[in-house]
Curated annotation (Swiss-Prot):
Gene Ontology biological process: threonyl-tRNA aminoacylation
Matches recorded under InterPro entries: aa-tRNA-synt_IIb, aa-tRNA-synth_II, aa-tRNA-synth_II/BPL/LPL, Anticodon-bd, Anticodon-bd_dom_sf, Beta-grasp_dom_sf, TGS, TGS-like
One Gene Ontology term, aspect cellular component: cytosol
GO molecular function: ATP binding; metal ion binding; threonine-tRNA ligase activity; tRNA binding
Keywords: Aminoacyl-tRNA synthetase, ATP-binding, Cytoplasm, Ligase, Metal-binding, Nucleotide-binding, Protein biosynthesis, RNA-binding, tRNA-binding, Zinc
Protein's organism: Burkholderia ambifaria (strain MC40-6)
Cofactor note as given: Binds 1 zinc ion per subunit.
TGS domain ranges (all copies): 1-61
Subunit structure, as described in the record: Homodimer.
UniProt name for this protein: Threonine--tRNA ligase
Length: 635
């Protein structure tokens, strides 16, 4: 007798072992038809999986997130099937699920073209319509490796050799195609109805640039056409908002081959940067942080003591001078510990909060670089809090409050919080981890925040809170972190004198709100589609004269506004006013101030807000008051 416990708490009993599909059919024909897989005692399995013991089972359909993953994974295999039918000489490698879709890497003797993608997608649709059953079988390692070698699939054979001896080797087949996979997969290809191939990109075998270059075909798959249409529309909108395009259009920054991964900031872009940095500086100063500055280049011995030289060297830029090895700092933490150590610290000095807009460099692979989002040289709004164990919850509460307020000011209302918990390999005792993890939970609870827990995802030196902001397109970006560190103070010898005159290690909290300034500015540009709120905009207003006769008044007006702290420019060019208005509208300036003879004579301005909104004619004082009202909440 086999007892199956369902999600609603009910128990069904079967006299013999049953498959997931049979359980679904016993519940109802509709569920049997909709079933894509099952979750057996928490593990995803195929509908063909036989259950021969008492277990908990949930039937997975396309209404479940796991169901969508199964569809995407199966569609990746459908892609490989179609490629092998159309291009038999192509070799298949791997095809995982990624955010919003999947990819599959191929080795082929020529580049795939857009026309190839159209043919492949059409063949995928044809195979899906055949509704071919997908079957799974478990085989020996030798049988699997021998099979793939016999059909010339050397990459699959290599993957099999790297699979742990304790793992099962599963082969999935549909039609004439067999692939190696952990699964699970849909029961038949007819379940795959909504998909689209997106693009081809280069990729290295096993992600190593020393290996062969492959071709990666990206695709997306969904349960409903409306969802795919919505996703494709979002991609179109994202293309319009691409910070690289807007950076050029708005004359904010550029990048060039002579300095890969580094940014050349133009005056308008640097003005935007300064607004963000000055705002962040105000906020951390008000929160009791002390701003410091640490060296960009430090001796190898410090990086060895911190552990970075042994564990992070391949990502560090190094140099040598007078027979000494140095590294350009990839992060600020070791330098902040040096400041803390400089002098005897007492428990009365704690908490100490050191902040730095620290310039860091990391030797990212050239293929991973992406505009402002992935660079080699960047500035972090970095800070480290040194406190006692009794103080760290209060410090965490204060940081949560500060971070959420900052995100709101920048226009981000939806923040997802994730708490990464202890990994298997870790420093410190279980009791220390218990206190650390519960302390971060208590801090989040005290702030009225909800969070998702990620078991095993913490760093070996402590648990971490991550702050993921959602932009206007619904995309999630991890920006902020609050990382508890149980190791670095010990490694670098940081200590303070406790109340009982003993020497103790401080608790160290690494924290950032925006993270990389470059990346955050890229996110901001895309979130606002380049139309920055007035408090951030490089220019808050531009004064435009209609004819030469108003040039003197327009110039005087510009100077008056500048003296009142308005970021304003004057456009006195001898061009048609319609041309000038259009140009500055495309530059997304918040306010255009137009002056003609009437405005000059009455000492007024005609105000146009962004979006072509006509605010009418008003005295300059009234405009300044309106602008100040816009800015008041950020002063």
């Amino acid at each position: 007798m086999v007892s199956i416990r369902l999600p609603d708490g009910s128990v069904r009993q079967y006299e013999h072992p049953v498959t997931v599909a049979e359980v679904a059919a016993s519940i109802g024909p509709g569920l049997a038809k909709a079933a894509l897989g099952g979750k057996l005692d928490g593990e995803l399995v195929d509908t063909s999986t036989v259950i021969d013991r008492d277990a908990a089972l949930a039937i997975i359909t396309d209404k479940d997130a796991d169901g969508l993953d199964i569809i995407r994974h199966s569609t990746a295999h459908l892609l490989a099937y179609a490629v092998k039918e159309l291009y038999p000489d192509a070799q298949v490698t791997i095809g995982p699920v990624i955010d919003n879709g999947f990819y599959y890497d191929f080795s082929y003797n020529r580049p795939f073209t857009p026309e190839d993608l159209e043919k492949i997608e059409k063949r995928m649709q044809e195979i899906a319509k055949k509704d071919e059953p997908v079957t799974r079988r478990v085989v020996s390692r030798d049988e699997a490796a021998g099979y793939f070698r016999s059909i010339g699939e050397k990459y699959k054979a290599e993957i099999i050799e790297s699979i742990p001896q304790t793992d099962e080797i599963k082969l999935y087949s549909h039609g004439g195609f067999t692939d190696l996979c952990r699964g699970p997969h849909v029961p038949s290809t007819g379940k795959l109805k909504v998909f689209k191939l997106m693009k081809v990109a280069g990729a290295y075998w096993r992600g190593d640039s020393k290996n062969e270059q492959l071709q990666r075909i990206y695709g997306t798959a969904w349960t409903k056409k409306e969802d795919q249409d919505q996703y494709l529309h979002m991609l179109e909108e994202a293309e319009k908002r691409d910070h690289r395009k807007l950076g050029k259009q708005l004359d904010l920054f550029h990048m060039q081959e002579e300095s890969p991964g580094m940014v050349f900031w133009h005056p308008k872009g640097w003005a935007l940067w300064q607004q963000v940095e000055q705002y962040m500086r105000r906020r951390v100063n008000d929160a009791g942080y002390l701003e410091i500055k640490t060296p960009m280049i430090m001796d190898r011995s410090l990086w060895e003591a911190s552990g970075h030289w042994q564990n992070y060297r391949e990502n560090m830029f190094t140099t040598e001078s007078e027979k000494r090895d140095y590294a350009i700092k990839p992060m600020n933490c070791p330098g902040h510990v040096q400041v803390f150590k400089h002098g005897l610290r007492s428990y009365r000095d704690l908490p100490l909060r050191y902040a730095e807009f620290g310039s860091c460099h990391r030797n990212e692979a050239s293929g991973a670089l992406h505009g402002l989002m992935r660079v080699r040289g960047f500035v972090q709004d970095d800070a480290h809090i040194f406190c006692t164990e009794e103080q760290f919850i209060a410090e965490s509460i204060a940081f949560n409050t500060l971070a959420m307020s900052v995100y709101k000011d920048f226009g981000f209302e939806h923040i997802d919080i994730k708490l990464s918990l202890r990994p298997e390999q870790r420093a410190g005792t279980d009791e220390t981890w218990d206190r650390a993890e519960q302390g971060l939970r208590d801090a989040l609870t005290a702030c009225g925040l909800s969070w998702e827990e990620l078991p095993g995802e913490g760093a070996f030196y402590g648990p971490k809170i991550e702050y993921h902001i959602k932009d206007a397109l619904g995309r999630s970006w991890q920006c902020g972190t609050l990382q508890l560190d149980m190791v670095l103070p010990e490694r670098l010898g940081a200590e303070y004198v406790a109340e009982d005159n003993s020497r103790r290690r401080p608790v160290m909290l690494h924290r950032a709100i925006v993270g990389s300034m470059e990346r955050f500015l890229g996110i901001l540009i895309e979130h606002h589609a380049g139309a920055m709120p007035a408090w951030l905009a490089p220019f808050q207003a531009v004064v435009l004269n209609i004819a030469e006769s108003q040039a003197e008044y327009a110039h005087s007006l510009t100077q008056t506004l500048q003296k009142q702290g308005v970021r304003v420019a004057g456009d006195l060019r001898n061009e048609k006013i319609s041309y000038k208005i259009r140009e500055h509208t495309l530059e997304k300036v918040p306010y255009l101030l137009v002056v003609g003879d009437k405005e000059r004579d009455a000492q007024t301005v005609a105000v146009r807000a962004r979006g072509g909104v006509d605010l009418g004619v008003m005295p300059i004082e009234a405009f300044v008051e309106r602008l100040q009202e816009d800015l008041r909440s950020f002063k």
